[in-house]
Swiss-Prot record:
Residues annotated as signal peptide: 1-19
Domain of life from the UniProt record: Eukaryota
Family, as annotated: Belongs to the neurotoxin 10 (Hwtx-1) family. 13 (Hntx-13) subfamily.
A Pfam family that the UniProt record links to this protein: Toxin_12
Keywords of the record: Disulfide bond, Ion channel impairing toxin, Knottin, Secreted, Signal, Toxin
GO molecular function: ion channel inhibitor activity; toxin activity
Protein name: U7-theraphotoxin-Hhn1a 2
Subcellular localization: Secreted
GO cellular component assignments: extracellular region
Native species: Cyriopagopus hainanus
UniProt note: domains: The presence of a 'disulfide through disulfide knot' structurally defines this protein as a knottin.
Amino acid sequence: MKIAIFTVVLALAVFAVLSFGWEANEKALSEEFTELIHEKEAASETEARECRYFWGECHDHMPCCDWLVCRYKWPITYNICVWNRTFPEK
């Protein structure tokens, strides 16, 4: 009987140690994934366009391309670039 109880307690201790290790590994992977996302986001910001394309979000500091105009369109809660009914000259 004592051996069975000792075995159960030992097994629970092993499971506790293993789960702690898995949790630490999972947290490390989560942090690594978050850093990777931030790096990709920073890389895409450096490749920002000079103008916003069709249906792109626009503001004073983010102008639309020449053949588009910045308008508020309901139900969208921000301004978007829409066609101004002209064609760009090439």
